[in-house]
């Protein structure tokens, strides 16, 4: 899978690719990432990339001619993703859709963002949350990480991402490791029992409990299994 990240600050992106699983995936040729400096397409001697907004207002806006010149150099691509707080929510489902593509272009803005006409050249406009960052680089890296980890071979155990939060529509169950007791807090006995069916039941139950407590809106639209539906009914009776 190939990525092109277009940004005014390439040195914010490159170090992220030099650590951990992304570094290994790059070294093994499982993914390719090109980081494009938007300023290389700037205008004039000073490589100008932005201008004041029509109609007045604070801040500067990235020019469409500069942004599209950088974008067209990266084409062809399966998807052109513009990162913006005004975009549709980036979810695990969207990550799975994008992970099936061969080439993604990620447009990371700055200042007041891109001239609105740049949206005409994007296939998707995505947001990673209802808040505003100083630039789109963190959002672009979130999309890159969430999709790259779904590429076969990037994560050693394929079961790992099949059990992630949101894959089944619920949050993940709580995880524990050694020691079995820490400052009076014990690991649930069922996890030490070696009884696989009971462990699975506990995990499904705690995933439901955690989701109800932290993200109750997810439960209403999650495709619950028969076991999860029974567990949910039991929890309702307990209340």
Curated annotation (Swiss-Prot):
One cellular-component annotation, GO: cytosol
Annotated EC: 2.1.1.228
Positions annotated to bind S-adenosyl-L-methionine: 109, 128-133
Localization, UniProt: Cytoplasm
Superkingdom of the source species: Bacteria
Alphabetized UniProt keyword annotations: Cytoplasm, Methyltransferase, S-adenosyl-L-methionine, Transferase, tRNA processing
GO molecular function, one term: tRNA (guanine(37)-N1)-methyltransferase activity
HAMAP family referenced in this protein's UniProt entry, alphabetically: TrmD
PANTHER family referenced in this protein's UniProt entry, alphabetically: TRNA (GUANINE-N(1)-)-METHYLTRANSFERASE (PTHR46417:SF1)
Function: Specifically methylates guanosine-37 in various tRNAs.
Name the UniProt record assigns to this protein: tRNA (guanine-N(1)-)-methyltransferase
Organism: Thermus thermophilus (strain ATCC BAA-163 / DSM 7039 / HB27)
């Amino acid at each position: 899978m190939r990525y092109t990240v277009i940004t005014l600050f390439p040195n914010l992106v490159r170090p992220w690719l030099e650590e951990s699983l992304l570094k290994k995936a790059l070294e093994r040729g499982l993914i390719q990432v090109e980081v494009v400096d938007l300023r290389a397409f700037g205008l004039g001697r000073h490589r100008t990339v932005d201008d004041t907004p029509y109609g007045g207002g604070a801040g500067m806006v990235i020019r469409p001619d500069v942004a599209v010149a950088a974008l067209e150099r990266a084409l062809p691509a399966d998807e052109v993703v513009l990162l913006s707080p005004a975009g549709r929510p980036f979810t695990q489902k969207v990550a799975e859709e994008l992970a099936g593509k061969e080439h993604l272009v990620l447009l990371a803005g700055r200042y007041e963002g891109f001239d609105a006409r740049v949206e005409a050249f994007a296939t998707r406009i995505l947001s990673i949350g209802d808040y505003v960052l100083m630039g789109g680089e963190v959002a672009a890296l979130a999309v890159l990480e969430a999709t790259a980890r779904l590429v076969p071979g990037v994560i050693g155990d394929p079961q790992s991402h099949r059990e992630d939060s949101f894959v089944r529509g619920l949050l993940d169950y709580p995880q524990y490791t050694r020691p079995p007791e820490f400052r009076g807090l014990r690991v649930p006995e069922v996890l030490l029992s070696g009884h696989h069916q009971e462990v699975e039941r506990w995990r499904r139950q705690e995933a439901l409990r955690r989701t109800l407590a932290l993200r109750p809106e997810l439960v209403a639209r999650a495709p619950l299994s028969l076991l999860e539906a029974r567990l949910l009914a039991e929890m309702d009776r307990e209340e």
